């Protein structure tokens, strides 16, 4: 399961915890990953994944987002991943709660 592979990889690569859902008592800075779509062709899987970087400030969320992108740009070093490419990233602050976050979207090709 690519989600578990990426979760483990990012937890070892980042200085902030990474989850697959928002924790009940979230730390100040953390990342939530989610697979938003997938396809398969010629035995190769493609998954689109989002990476939501939360922090106590806009700057902190942007910094964490950059760390996520740096790590994900190297995810093709994993034996299950053949390619990891940034699709888009942007400010994704929750306006109703003022929780600062950035979101990066990646296309990941994997076995």
Task: Show the residue positions of the predicted features.
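Charged, amphipathic alpha-helical segments and their flanking helix caps
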Residues: 1-16, 25, 34-111
